[in-house]
Amino acid sequence: MINVRVINKKRRIQKYKVSVKSGDTIKVISGKYKNIVAKVLRVLKYSNEIIVKGVNIKIKHIKPVRDNEMGSLKSLEFPINISKVVLLESRKKE
């Protein structure tokens, strides 16, 4: 999937309008993680994607920086398209 940036007449990159904010509870409606209910960790407005806790987890290999260190594996949540989710409960302002 290619992330397309929308450019307006003044040649500036526009943000997409999103109805989901970080901290909201959402439900994934399509894809590998269908019917999973989780919280939004981060919203990426320029690429129309969100990072959801426990969804789209991939393993990243980290190389050793120094000679005496060992490499490691780190599990990270990667973004999914916002069109694959539906808002269940929004975060309450306190």
Swiss-Prot record:
A molecular-function term among this protein's GO annotations: structural constituent of ribosome
GO biological process: translation
Transmembrane intervals: none
Places the protein is found: Plastid, Chloroplast
Major subcellular site: plastid
Cellular component, GO, one term: chloroplast
InterPro entries per the UniProt record, alphabetical: KOW, Rib_uL2_dom2, Ribosomal_uL24, Ribosomal_uL24_CS, Ribosomal_uL24_KOW, Translation_prot_SH3-like_sf
Assigned keywords, A-Z: Chloroplast, Plastid, Ribonucleoprotein, Ribosomal protein, RNA-binding, rRNA-binding
Cysteines paired by S-S bonds: none
Function description: One of two assembly initiator proteins, it binds directly to the 5'-end of the 23S rRNA, where it nucleates assembly of the 50S subunit.
Family membership: Belongs to the universal ribosomal protein uL24 family.
NCBIfam families for the chain: rplX_bact
Subunit relationships: Part of the 50S ribosomal subunit.
Protein name in the entry: Large ribosomal subunit protein uL24c
Species of origin: Cyanidium caldarium
